[in-house]
């Protein structure tokens, strides 16, 4: 690596470390505790109006079961609305291109995808979805799916911080505050900045331009900047254009690239410090943050190294070392593409500024492992935090078993119920990618979708279902997934991955809230410092990533050795 690459990585992490504690404290005040902030003078009346119009009583607290029921009811209503909008878009306004309604299976897949914060796209946005569908059906979910994840994370924090309580907050109040005080203001500012960088924002269908060859080309446009801002900030990832953040009208400059990466990580990173504030343990927050940052750096440097080594066949033909620039934008280069790919697969975002299908086998392996570790390396908005709490509980439990102490976390005893729910969430998240991948690999509909045979074809299948279950949404684009079987199975994978982890973690929150914290003494396992950080890292890697080792051996690992031997499919 050159000095410039080290500088970019240091600048990114430095800005993240400076901004995250500030935003984390703000989220603690505005969402976790519902206190007055400097935004309340403007948005407070809007919040109260929403409560009155919706019949919400923000002071009414809910048990974890009531909280979960509200979450599921809200999600079901949002799914039905978006499904209807997509099916009927040819009869709705703001459709200057005259796009027809989507097929039932594509509408089902897309509605589930945006509902679950996955944003998997089996279609090209600029040639399939109308402006109305983008703004009302999809951009709406970019806000509320992220807000739902943030609300669940806040509920988990309350469960850890409360003592002898039967409630964990109010889902509706948490949802409204998350949108009004966190997502909406930041995305508004970011959208304006992105417009200044050259991201388009118009209601026009597009424009026709003369090319250098003397011909004419129609360039699709639309309300892009507003959707890009929230798709990054909410770790959604679904692009306005099919090329996503590689498109010059969606991510035109190196500065816009940096801002979009910061937007992806900023809320998940900040929530770590909100947790520290909630439980009055900032050292614990910094330890968890450094674990995330170290895993992120390892992923970025590994991916960068794999791409700079290139492929032996091209090196042999060129008679000189050739880096792998296939599928990458020259304006970002290998390091800018590698860091973005690591950010987006760490954070369950799924936006891409380079084609992951064109990565080297080891480069693709890094992106797969990032997701398979549970999307806890900062992770999605909310989901990264409560996913990390899951691994923290397992770490504390295992540490207690090793030293013969009763495991406790923040003064509260970890009992069989919490461990059972945590393991249930892990098993639920790990099973669908392996099961669906196995079925697709031996089925006619699965093989028919492949453009590549052999190990890389299997990697495409495994990547798709891993991305779906982990609510990431990125893809190895050589897979033609727009068919009834693919759309339905991927939608099921997304639903299982989203609610199969959310609901058990709400159960953990309810169980922990009912306990009384004991004074933390010398016999309590410390949840800060090097020892805890190392043990947490090992648990994430062993429990999270090694679950998939046999499948990875059949995909990118085999493909890497075939590449070294000069084998092609």
Curated annotation (Swiss-Prot):
The UniProt record lists the keyword Cell membrane: yes
Main location: membrane
Compartments where found: Cell inner membrane
Membrane topology: Multi-pass membrane protein
Coiled coil: none
InterPro entries, alphabetized: KdpA
GO cellular component terms attached to this protein's record: plasma membrane
Segments passing through the bilayer: 3-23, 68-88, 136-156, 179-199, 259-279, 284-304, 384-404, 422-442, 490-510, 534-554
Record keywords, A-Z: Cell inner membrane, Cell membrane, Ion transport, Membrane, Potassium, Potassium transport, Transmembrane, Transmembrane helix, Transport
GO molecular function: P-type potassium transmembrane transporter activity; potassium ion binding
PANTHER family, alphabetized: POTASSIUM-TRANSPORTING ATPASE A CHAIN (PTHR30607), POTASSIUM-TRANSPORTING ATPASE POTASSIUM-BINDING SUBUNIT (PTHR30607:SF2)
Quaternary assembly: The system is composed of three essential subunits: KdpA, KdpB and KdpC.
Function: Part of the high-affinity ATP-driven potassium transport (or Kdp) system, which catalyzes the hydrolysis of ATP coupled with the electrogenic transport of potassium into the cytoplasm. This subunit binds the periplasmic potassium ions and delivers the ions to the membrane domain of KdpB through an intramembrane tunnel.
Family from the record: Belongs to the KdpA family.
The protein's name: Potassium-transporting ATPase potassium-binding subunit
Species in which this protein is naturally found: Nitratidesulfovibrio vulgaris (strain DP4)
Gene, per the UniProt record: kdpA
């Amino acid at each position: 690596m050159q000095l410039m690459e080290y500088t970019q990585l240091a600048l990114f992490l430095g800005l993240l470390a400076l901004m995250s504690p500030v935003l984390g404290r703000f989220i603690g005040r505005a969402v976790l505790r519902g206190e007055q902030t400097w935004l309340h003078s403007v948005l407070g009346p809007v919040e109260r109006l929403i409560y009155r119009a919706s019949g919400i009583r923000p002071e009414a607290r809910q048990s974890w079961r009531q909280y979960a029921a509200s979450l599921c009811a809200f999600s079901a209503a949002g799914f039905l609305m978006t499904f209807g909008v997509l099916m009927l878009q040819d009869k709705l306004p703001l459709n200057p291109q005259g796009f027809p309604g989507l097929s039932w299976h594509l509408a089902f897949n897309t509605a589930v995808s945006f509902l679950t914060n996955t944003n998997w796209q089996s279609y090209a946005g600029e040639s399939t979805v109308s402006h109305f569908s983008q703004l009302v059906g999809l951009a709406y979910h970019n806000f509320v799916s992220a807000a739902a994840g943030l609300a669940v994370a806040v509920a988990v924090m309350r469960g850890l911080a409360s003592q002898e309580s039967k409630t964990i907050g109010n889902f509706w109040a948490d949802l409204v505050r998350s949108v009004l005080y966190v997502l909406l203001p930041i995305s508004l500012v970011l959208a304006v900045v992105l417009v200044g960088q050259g991201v388009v924002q118009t209601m026009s269908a597009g424009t026709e331009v003369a090319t250098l060859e003397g011909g004419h080309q129609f360039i699709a446009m639309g309300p892009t900047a507003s959707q890009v801002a929230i798709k990054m900030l909410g770790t959604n990832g679904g692009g306005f254009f099919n090329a996503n953040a590689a498109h010059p009208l969606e991510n035109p400059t190196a500065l816009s690239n940096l801002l979009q990466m910061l937007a992806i990580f900023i809320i998940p990173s900040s929530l770590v410090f909100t947790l520290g504030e909630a439980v009055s343990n900032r050292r614990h927050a910094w330890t968890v943050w450094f674990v995330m940052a170290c895993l992120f750096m390892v992923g970025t440097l590994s991916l960068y190294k794999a791409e700079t080594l290139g492929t032996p066949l091209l090196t042999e033909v060129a008679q000189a070392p050739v880096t792998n620039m296939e599928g990458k934008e020259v304006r970002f280069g290998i390091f800018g593409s590698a860091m973005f790919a690591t950010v987006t697969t760490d954070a369950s975002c799924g936006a891409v500024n380079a084609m992951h299908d064109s990565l080297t086998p080891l480069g693709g392996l890094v992106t797969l492992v990032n997701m398979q570790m549970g999307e806890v390396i900062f992770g999605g908005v909310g989901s990264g935090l409560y996913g990390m709490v899951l691994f923290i509980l397992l770490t504390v439990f295992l540490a207690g078993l090793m030293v013969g102490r009763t495991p406790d976390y923040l003064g509260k005893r970890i009992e069989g119920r919490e461990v059972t729910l945590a393991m249930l969430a892990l098993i639920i998240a790990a099973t669908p990618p392996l099961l669906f991948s196995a079925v697709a690999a031996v089925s006619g509909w699965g093989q028919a979708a492949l453009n590549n045979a052999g190990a890389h074809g299997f990697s495409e299948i495994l990547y798709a279902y891993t991305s779906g279950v982990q609510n990431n949404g990125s893809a190895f684009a050589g897979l033609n997934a727009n068919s009834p079987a693919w759309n339905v199975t991927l939608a099921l994978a997304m639903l299982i991955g989203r609610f199969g982890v959310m609901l058990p973690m709400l159960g953990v929150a309810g169980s922990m809230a009912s306990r009384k914290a004991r004074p933390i003494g010398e016999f309590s396992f410390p949840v800060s410092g090097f020892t805890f950080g190392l043990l947490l890292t090992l648990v994430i890697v062993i429990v999270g990533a090694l679950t998939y080792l046999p499948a990875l051996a059949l995909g990118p690992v085999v493909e890497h050795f075939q590449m070294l031997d000069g084998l092609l499919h």
